[in-house]
Structure formats: structure tokens, C-alpha cells
């Protein structure tokens, strides 16, 4: 398969970036998108040119690091997959593929296709956890009854990998889907009730401080999410936030 890649190159967050064109050949349909970029980088290194910087880690759709905008879509044309799970058979011989970093004020470019998504870490650190006293009086989790529907919904919310596709897909660069998933996975379980008020207030406030936009119910985030996180989580977080505001 012969392709033309048009890739965003940018030396750092303050530099002016540009699209650079790279022809590439010999690409097989069974290659992943990242393996295709590996082939390109091997060619660039052989020529003495600087390789394209992109983020990746597990390459199994778990870590959320491989966040790329491919032909204008977060993670590319396939659904419910991350970039590392996208195979080149989704493209045709002779195609031109545009590859860019995720675009958001809160995701500054580090270099080329890599962005700094530590804003998500700070939102998580603000309240995405449960405080536990482990000094000998911890109760076995299985001893606390949990409604099956709540358990299923909490598990579904917890599958969020924090890749940032929701932000990249949103016209407002909103992080509501990510934040609501992290709020929901605890709001639905008894273990999360003790800190529920402080959690939702702290996480939403941190989200706003990071410079993410607001949600206007477009729904692009749910469509592009590789884990299929539901918009229902945003509605739940709004309810949790309202309850917490009234208590405060």
C-alpha cells in the first residue's frame, strides 16, 4: 500500500507548526497505525532526518497515550478503538492521511504529535479517589451490597482511559465526559458516598481551572470515545454537582 502522509510538525509549544508531507510505501493492511508510523520513522532516521514524535505506551488500547487526530477524527475512522488498535486496512492504496495532535487549550503541544494531557491528572488528583484507613479496620468490599445496575454503570464509567478523545472531538474542548466518568464510578458505589460532595466540587472546579470549555450537549464525545463512555455520566455529574452546591 502506498500512502501520502501529511503530518503536523512542531518543535515545541511556543514554536509555529506546519504540515509536512511524507510519501510512504510498502504498508500492509495488518499493520497498526502506530506500526506504520514506526516504519516512517525508521526511514527518516536512515535518511538522517528527525523522526516524528508521537505518544504511545501499551499499544493495547488500555493506557490512552496514543492520542492522534487522523483525518480530522480522534483515533481515526474506526469506532470503539484507540489509535494503536486502528489497522491500516481501514485505508486504501493511494490515500492521503492527515495526522495531527489533539487540539485544545488545555492540551499544549509538547512536540509534533505529542501533547501534554497532565490536566487530566490534576482533575483526577483533585478528587478521583476514595480515602481508606488501612490500619486494621478495613471492611471487605464484598461485605457491602451493591445494586447490580449501579455496579454495571460504575464499571462502565471506570473503563475511561483518559485518552482525551472527548476533548478533541468537542467543539468547545470540554472535558465533561472524562470528568463525569471519574465522578460516576464512585458516585454509584457506597464506598464513594462519604466524599461525594467534596469530590464533585473539587473535580469540576479543577476542570474549569484547566481551561476546558463547557458542554453544550453536541454528543461528539460519546461517538468518538474509544470506550463508549455514555453521556448519561454527564447528566449524573450535573445532578451530583447540584446536590453538592445545595449542601454547601
What are these language model-derived features?
Residues 20-32:
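Short, contiguous acidic and Ser/Thr-rich linear segments
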Residues 8, 25, 70-72:
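Short strand-turn-strand beta-turns centered on an Asx-Gly dipeptide
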Residues 62, 68-70, 221:
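Functionalized membrane-embedded alpha-helices
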Residues 31-50, 100-248:
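Ferredoxin-type iron-sulfur electron-transfer modules in oxidoreductases and energy-metabolism complexes
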Residues 53-65:
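Short, structured protein-protein interaction patches enriched in aromatics and acidic/basic residues
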Residues 70-94, 99:
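Glycine-rich phosphate/adenylate-binding loop and adjacent beta-alpha elements
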